[in-house]
């Protein structure tokens, strides 16, 4: 009896497997048929303005009730599109509430643009106060709000793109959820998260640059950064001097040829191994300075020092080493 049941089950499964391909083939055939004209087998096009599907060859109107699922309004630029859109912005990790809460504007005006009376202004101020309290209900949310504000402020000062800010916010959230903050300052962890994020995105900034815009010193930043990377197991490659070249060249107003020359100098230095143990910022600055001289562009060591935020002595030392490598490459 059991053998008979098993056989029947197998047959049913086999039958279902045979049916599914046939059904999919039938669906594909029907889909292909709907894309051609039933009269002349010509190509069909959709006229979205009139809501019709017509044949290009014979002009037959195949369907005249096509639904336009787009907005009923038109916009000619991004600003106009944003102003007419009736949906909110996408959620973001850069805000402590991910942008889902309501924010009461600071303008004391009604919907018609008229100024509020003194009594109404007092009421609105109380509403703003209570709204702010509800947005940060506990210490964890207040911590997150302060940290993400710091990340946004520092990223703006350093000219870092939005994707770096988003990644830094995610890193800080992970540190907060893993309870890594006790014994460390909010500013220190936030700065470390931004430093790590910038390196991961290939747009690194030096520790000296982070120290200038942060409220923590370089020693605390270094210590906290190593702790965060170790505990969160972040995969961060050593900083590449070439990643600093585009920014330095842009701020100094150098040509594309000078930038290419600087990259080539750094590649030659890597092949010889002289970059090992040296600051990537110093090497990049020296390469940019050397490339400017090789392409006959006027740049002083002082200008490069200001842009790269390193001493002129470091630039001179690395510059000599790069030229030695360049001379050896040309002789070879």
UniProtKB/Swiss-Prot annotation:
Entry keywords, A to Z: Metal-binding, Repeat, Transcription, Transcription regulation, Zinc, Zinc-finger
Repeat (Sequence) residue spans along the chain: 149-232, 243-324
Assigned GO CC terms: transcription preinitiation complex
GO molecular function: DNA-binding transcription factor activity; TBP-class protein binding; zinc ion binding
InterPro entries on file: Cyclin-like_dom (IPR013763), Cyclin-like_sf (IPR036915), TFIIB (IPR000812), TFIIB_arc (IPR023484), TFIIB_CS (IPR023486), TFIIB_cyclin (IPR013150), Znf_TFIIB (IPR013137)
Coiled coil listed as a keyword: no
Swiss-Prot/TrEMBL induction comment: By heat shock (60 degrees Celsius), with a 2-fold increase (at protein level).
Zinc finger (TFIIB-type): 33-63
Basic and acidic residues biased stretches: 14-29
Domain of life, per lineage: Archaea
Compositionally biased tracts (Polar residues): 1-10
Region (Disordered): 1-36, 77-106
GO BP of this protein: transcription preinitiation complex assembly
Binding positions (Zn(2+)): 37, 40, 55, 58
Note: There are 6-12 TFIIB paralogs in this organism.
Similarity comment: family membership: Belongs to the TFIIB family.
Cited function: Stabilizes TBP binding to an archaeal box-A promoter. Also responsible for recruiting RNA polymerase II to the pre-initiation complex (DNA-TBP-TFIIB).
Listed name of the protein: Transcription initiation factor IIB 2
Taxonomic classification: Archaea, Methanobacteriati, Methanobacteriota, Stenosarchaea group, Halobacteria
């Amino acid at each position: 009896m059991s053998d008979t049941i098993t056989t029947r089950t197998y047959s049913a499964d086999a039958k279902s497997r045979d049916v599914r391909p046939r059904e999919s083939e039938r669906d594909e055939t029907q889909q292909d048929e709907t894309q051609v004209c039933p009269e002349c087998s010509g190509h069909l096009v959709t006229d979205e303005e009139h809501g019709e599907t017509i044949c290009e060859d014979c002009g037959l109107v195949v369907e005249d009730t096509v639904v336009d699922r787009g907005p009923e309004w038109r916009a000619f630029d991004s600003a106009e599109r944003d102003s007419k859109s009736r949906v909110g912005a996408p959620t973001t990790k850069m805000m402590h509430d991910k942008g889902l809460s309501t924010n009461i504007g600071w303008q004391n005006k009604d919907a018609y643009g008229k100024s509020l009376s003194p009594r109404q202004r007092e009421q609105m101020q109380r509403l703003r106060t209570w709204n702010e309290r509800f947005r940060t209900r506990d210490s964890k949310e207040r911590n997150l709000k302060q940290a993400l504000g710091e990340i946004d402020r520092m990223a703006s000062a350093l000219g870092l793109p939005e994707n770096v800010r988003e990644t830094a916010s995610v890193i800080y959230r992970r540190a907060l959820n893993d309870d890594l903050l006790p014994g460390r300052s909010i500013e220190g962890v936030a700065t470390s998260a931004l430093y790590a994020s910038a390196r991961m995105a290939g747009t690194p900034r030096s520790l000296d640059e982070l120290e200038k815009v942060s409220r923590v010193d370089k020693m605390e930043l270094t210590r906290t950064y190593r702790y965060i990377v170790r505990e969160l197991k972040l995969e961060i490659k050593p900083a590449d001097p070439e990643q600093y070249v585009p920014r330095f060249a842009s701020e100094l107003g150098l040509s594309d040829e000078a930038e290419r020359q600087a990259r080539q100098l750094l590649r030659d230095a890597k092949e010889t191994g002289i970059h090992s143990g040296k600051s990537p910022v110093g090497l990049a600055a020296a390469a940019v300075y050397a490339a400017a001289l090789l392409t006959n562009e006027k740049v002083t060591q002082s200008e490069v020092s200001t842009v790269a935020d390193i001493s002129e002595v470091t630039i001179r030392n690395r510059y000599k080493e790069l030229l030695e490598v360049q001379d050896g490459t040309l002789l070879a």
